[in-house]
Amino acid sequence: MMRRWRQWKHTRLMPEKKQGDMDGVKSVLSQLIRNNIFADEDQIVLVKGCYIINLGKFDKDGIMAKAIVYFVTSKLNNIYEELPPQATNAERVELRHFTVIDEAHYMLGFKNKPLQNLIAVGRNKGKSVILATQNMDSFKSKHFDFYANAQYPLIMKQQQQNDGVLKDLFGVSGIALQELKQAIAGLQKGELITKDNKAIALGLGKHWKKIKVTRF
């Protein structure tokens, strides 16, 4: 019912002479209706449980997968816009929710306004958005400067490295950049490289540090 109502509402907002035409939004809504992927009534409370949305049966770069992520991030935006800022003190900040988007490069190549808002609004609302991708070039999107909003970049071993992204993320150049690239190429299983914010603030040592993670 809600899906059809959204399509009807969008049609009503169009000029009268064009209400019978099929545009991009109506095309997506029509596919959502035909695939019957949403329940008639939304009863899921996204911030009070752990949910995995499996998009495996949809084309990763297709309109359906993008639409599902679009609607979920829109719902999260609506929730967090109503919340007060996160609680903080001298040592800690409140974390309310994590959203992890795997293979995020599929969601960075178009104007994904809900995702952009989620990152921008969520930063002081206790909302953490983790964008996982093997292609760091994707963060230099023409639609939104995602990596400029990356407070805690975590770099795993990868062969394809983008000098521009690494420079912007870690504030390095010249010899320091080459050392960082060598460190990334030499990472082992379970090892990550992240910013060393204390070293950056003090202007001492390297701008990055290596950490090792373990399975719990």
Where are the model-predicted features located?
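Conserved AAA+ ATPase core "coupling" helix
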Residues: 161-169
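Active-site-proximal loop/turn and secondary-structure-junction residues that shape catalytic pockets
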Residues: 57-59, 135-137, 160
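Hydrophobic/aromatic beta-strand patches that form the interior of the parallel beta-sheet core
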Residues: 51-53, 130, 152-154
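P-loop NTPase motor domains
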Residues: 1-127, 140-142, 165, 175, ...
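C-terminal alpha-helical "lid" subdomain
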Residues: 196-198, 204-216
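Conserved H-loop
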Residues: 124-127, 132-138, 157
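A short helix-turn-beta junction within AAA+ P-loop NTPase domains corresponding to the substrate/partner-engaging
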Residues: 143-157
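ASCE P-loop NTPase helicase motor core
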Residues: 139-144, 170
